[in-house]
């Protein structure tokens, strides 16, 4: 099949997971469209080159703030259309939970979109302090999470400062503290209750919903809260009903089921006399990381408009059936707002090609296991391929055991491997996925016979969910996509940890154990993009092997082009050492003592001292200059 732009899109499933923000251009480069297909197209290799010319180094995080605004606009437009279709007059507010990515360049950009259609959510005291500064006057702030008196006091101060803060009661003990602090400050609090739904959305994050959820009130506890408030000056303060169906909900039916249950809570609270003006449905809107449009954990089987409709319709029907005032619908879809806006770019530093295998010459003292392997290779065209592979596996294992017992030497051990790889490649050429009986062996061979692409980044720092929960992220070369990839490889990071390997890849609308990649060219960079990393990854990343934050740039649309709006240097080695308790002055003193004790010339001492200082203040990652 002739390689083409369409085939590049299909191979990496780009058109499905990209959601209109990324594609391949005629030059074989990945391009980003920050404001959608009708806007400017920006070449990712061109941006990386411009950032490097300005001093940035790889690995490099590219942020596209215009995507944040565009995603928010699409979310608001979807709910506007759904409310129009269902004749729902309650309105809609998209709340951003800043735990998804607290960076000022993310939360601040979203917060700059003024109006009733946007709000912020905090789940801790530091996050609350941030949103109190970011929110517009009169802006909606949802206060979730565990709370002590200081947290509650700060939220109430927000009310006195003209912000619409709502303290969501998630534990029965919180209500008493809220009422006491409100009385002390002389302010009427904005109150909400988080109800714990029995409905459970399937997926990796299902424990955030359902009866076993960490947060939320049981039906009895909800009634107890209302019993305390009813008939007091605070009764009219209970305005928010909040719930959470789960995060990254893959199946739209789970959303529909959760909304049916939640709507009953809204109706019952309203009939009891609570003035519920806002229904906060929490998160749940998923991202199709896989591009498979399915119910698997890292995909979704619905679109944005379907999501909005499944939220609006039950509330619209309930308000009509029970003659209730439609509440304002609030969502906390942080993942959907932010995932697309960030791309990590890293360079391949080296490739370890899978051995092709060979048939060694016959020697007089050849062990029986080597002779058997040689005979198997000679029968590749005469016997069933699968049968030969299983025999080769048997004798290969027998040879390894013999070597461990000292019965064969290293030379013959290497010959066994050579023959096994030669047989494996020969068997794979004779198998086809069209034959159902071939698939198990073919899958095993495809997983075994792959190159290792060593990439200048840390899985644990930049895409920690790959290690923690087997999260899928699309990975695509950002250039040479006008050439057919001729190798299959796995991506390995820089860390001294076998978990620093990506094990699943998006390919041809499914998942595979390896990724189609190109052969490296001497003296030419080969750069790979890790896409949809804008949600959670920066915040969850750790410092395994003391690899810290990468360099980052913000790339803003400027007319029909772009500009690098902001550049942030990543962590240097001295910053990482200081973070884990090293006294840098002492480190430098020890270096100086050892140089003096070595008895070198002044010139050599100066040169070594300069190199040590450069290492101490340098970027922890490898050089991004391609090897000659």
Swiss-Prot record:
Keyword Metal-binding in annotation: yes
Keywords assigned by UniProt, alphabetized: Decarboxylase, Lyase, Magnesium, Metal-binding, Polyamine biosynthesis, Pyridoxal phosphate, Spermidine biosynthesis
Superkingdom of the organism of origin: Bacteria
Catalysis performed (reactions): L-arginine + H(+) = agmatine + CO2
Transmembrane residue ranges: none
Cofactor: Mg(2+); pyridoxal 5'-phosphate
N6-(pyridoxal phosphate)lysine, modified sites: 99
Gene3D superfamilies, alphabetized: 1.10.287.3440, 1.20.58.930, Alanine racemase, Lyase, Ornithine Decarboxylase, Chain A, domain 1
InterPro entries for the chain: Ala_racemase/Decarboxylase_C (IPR009006), Arg_decarb_HB (IPR040634), Arg_decarbox_C (IPR041128), Arg_decrbxlase (IPR002985), De-COase2_CS (IPR022657), De-COase2_N (IPR022644), Orn/DAP/Arg_de-COase (IPR000183), PLP-binding_barrel (IPR029066)
Amino-acid positions noted as binding substrate in the UniProt annotation, renumbered to this chain: 279-289
Molecular function in Gene Ontology: arginine decarboxylase activity; metal ion binding
E.C. code: 4.1.1.19
GO biological process, one term: spermidine biosynthetic process
Cell division in keyword set: no
Record PROSITE patterns: ODR_DC_2_2
Similarity comment text for this entry: Belongs to the Orn/Lys/Arg decarboxylase class-II family. SpeA subfamily.
Function: Catalyzes the biosynthesis of agmatine from arginine.
Protein's name according to its UniProt entry: Biosynthetic arginine decarboxylase
Protein's organism: Xylella fastidiosa (strain 9a5c)
